[in-house]
């Protein structure tokens, strides 16, 4: 995207973080799930795992006081940081100007809730064939943020995020495991996820009560035959995703029930036969490909709402 050379500057340590917070009158809040990274080695590791280069356009959600922001900018990348907290959004450009002044022109800060971000109100990525998300996500909204951005931005090609360890395990879980659930299978609609490392509690201020982990995700290419939605047009010209996600929600909303019982208002009996799926199985055993096959079968039977 650009031929910018990597920037030189100073990444934030614990003393820097506390000084910036004090100068700006900022205290970490539970409301926004704020735990600021105080270890330069950790943010460099995140950027390294994400594979960010000067050619990339990066979105960061929840930049906080700028620890990860500076590490991303250090690569020479261009980035847009989405911050919900007004004082933090206002402070971030000044922090970059202080610690990495030559990188200020490559940073755009958007004061907005990430769950409200769309290509229309944040058009920064409209000209990109693909962009990446690199973030230390607020633990309480990590999964909704990821699924929302993947739904709204077709060109969000990959992400590397730090989340609560239990959330990371669920995002990367495979069918049949006890932690496989709605986040796992919905994320699998878009691409492949894997856990790529753990992060200790002592690299944060304040230290959280839980461990953290890194999740790497790669989106399916449009022509990838492995993509569940590779052939996803429906009779009404929309996509199958809405029906597939409806099946997922119903199946995991009553995960101990058989598919026949959990999906009785959505899937007619013949749909299971058409899809080649045993209706006595539970939703926690189905792959995203099987949920997609069942959705296609329901469409071929007509209106799933009339299932008996």
From Swiss-Prot:
Pfam families according to UniProt: RrnaAD
Family (UniProt): Belongs to the class I-like SAM-binding methyltransferase superfamily. rRNA adenine N(6)-methyltransferase family. RsmA subfamily.
PROSITE patterns noted in UniProt: RRNA_A_DIMETH, SAM_RNA_A_N6_MT
Organism annotation: Bifidobacterium longum (strain NCC 2705)
GO MF term list: 16S rRNA (adenine(1518)-N(6)/adenine(1519)-N(6))-dimethyltransferase activity; RNA binding
Gene3D superfamilies, sorted: Ribosomal RNA adenine dimethylase-like, domain 2 (1.10.8.100), Vaccinia Virus protein VP39 (3.40.50.150)
E.C. number: 2.1.1.182
DNA-binding recorded as keyword: no
Superkingdom, taxonomy of origin: Bacteria
Disulfide bonds: none
InterPro entries, A to Z: KsgA/Erm, rRNA_Ade_diMease-like_C, rRNA_Ade_Mease_Trfase_CS, rRNA_Ade_methylase_Trfase_N, rRNA_adenine_dimethylase, SAM-dependent_MTases_sf
NCBIfam families tied to this protein: ksgA (TIGR00755)
SMART domains assigned to the protein according to its UniProt record, in alphabetical order: rADc
Reactions performed catalytically: adenosine(1518)/adenosine(1519) in 16S rRNA + 4 S-adenosyl-L-methionine = N(6)-dimethyladenosine(1518)/N(6)-dimethyladenosine(1519) in 16S rRNA + 4 S-adenosyl-L-homocysteine + 4 H(+)
Record-given protein name: Ribosomal RNA small subunit methyltransferase A
Protein residues bound to S-adenosyl-L-methionine: 35, 37, 62, 83, 113, 136
Subcellular location, record wording: Cytoplasm
